[in-house]
């Protein structure tokens, strides 16, 4: 039992820590089946093992492009361990008190303290997923530094208490590989180890995932979508299975919209592709070349003069 925690919850959803009553968050009850890529699930579960009384679990970071299934992977691992799951969605404006304990004005006019999903998992021995952790600022990360090392505690300045993690508490952080993120401080990255990279599923797994989410989708549309996604993966384009699900969903809704004047499947699918991913997605090879050129152009910029002069211009100040 964590230090300062007075027995079992004093009432449904509440615990007391050093005389302060905390309202606990609700566990996530979403279905969490994991399809394919069993090795990375085994790797995550290994991170959470404890092999000796003096050993501590690891808090890994799970990386990958948006929509590839990082959060679902963590959910499946929590389910495999038969532990309650709590998910905290990190954002650019997440504050330390959002991560830990938030004061709320109760109906009585008094201040009530609400534990975050993270703190609830800490106190109850659950699993917490810090989702999209690299969207969070350094000030918020700093409040978690002692939790992510051998101390396994956090300090709530708002409530004036120290919170110690239960021995069964487990944590991981998902991180998107895109440009719209913060750089996580090195002293935090050194605590979020190891790195588990989740890549795209293979053709069979991708088909199984789409069938799982859309069991009513016709086989020809499923095959068309999987073929598109596999081609995109081969060209290093970051279209994910989530995109495939959305393409199929919209196409199926368009097909069912007007039974008196049915749209052809190909027409509905092509329209859906454009509406979900844009017109450029109709020609993946051209899109891949454009993006490769854009990345190459970014890498070739050396100074301010590159914005105003061509590379071979004799007036270029850096030539």
Predicted stretch roles:
Residues 149-152, 195, 229-238, 296-309:
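Short flexible/disordered coil segments
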Residues 78, 262-319:
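C-terminal engagement/docking regions of AAA+ P-loop ATPases
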Residues 153, 201, 257-260, 282, ...:
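Charged, solvent-exposed alpha-helical segments that act as regulatory interaction surfaces
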Residues 52, 218, 252-256, 277-282:
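Short alpha-helix boundary/capping elements
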């Amino acid at each position: 039992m964590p230090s300062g925690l007075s027995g079992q919850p004093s009432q449904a959803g509440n615990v007391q820590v050093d005389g302060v009553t905390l309202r606990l968050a609700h566990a996530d009850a979403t279905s969490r089946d994991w399809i394919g890529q069993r090795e990375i699930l085994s790797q995550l579960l290994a991170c959470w093992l404890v092999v000796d009384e003096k050993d501590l679990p690891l808090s890994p970071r799970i990386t990958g492009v948006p929509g590839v299934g990082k959060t679902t992977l963590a959910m499946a691992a929590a389910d495999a361990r038969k532990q309650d799951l709590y998910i905290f969605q990190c954002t650019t404006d997440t504050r330390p008190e959002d991560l830990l304990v938030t004061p709320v004005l109760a109906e009585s006019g008094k201040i009530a303290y609400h534990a975050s999903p993270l703190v609830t998992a800490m106190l109850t021995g659950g699993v917490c997923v810090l989702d999209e952790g690299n969207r969070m600022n350094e000030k918020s990360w700093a409040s978690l530094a002692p939790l992510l090392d051998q101390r396994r505690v956090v300090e709530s300045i708002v409530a004036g208490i120290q919170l110690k993690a239960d021995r069964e508490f487990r944590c991981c952080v998902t991180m998107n590989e895109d440009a719209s993120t913060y750089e996580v401080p090195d002293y935090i990255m050194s605590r979020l180890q190891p790195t588990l990279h989740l890549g795209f599923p293979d053709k069979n797994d991708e088909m199984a995932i789409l069938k799982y989410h859309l069991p009513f989708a016709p086989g020809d549309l499923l095959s068309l979508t999987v073929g598109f996604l596999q081609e995109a993966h081969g060209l290093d384009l970051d279209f994910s299975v989530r995109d495939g699900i959305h393409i199929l969903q919209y196409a199926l809704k368009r097909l069912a919209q007007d039974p008196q004047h049915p749209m052809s499947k190909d027409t509905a699918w092509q329209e859906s592709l454009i509406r979900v991913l844009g017109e450029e997605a109709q020609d993946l090879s051209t899109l891949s070349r454009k993006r490769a050129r854009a990345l190459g152009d970014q890498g070739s910029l050396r100074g301010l003069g590159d914005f105003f002069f061509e590379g071979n211009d004799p007036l270029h100040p850096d030539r």
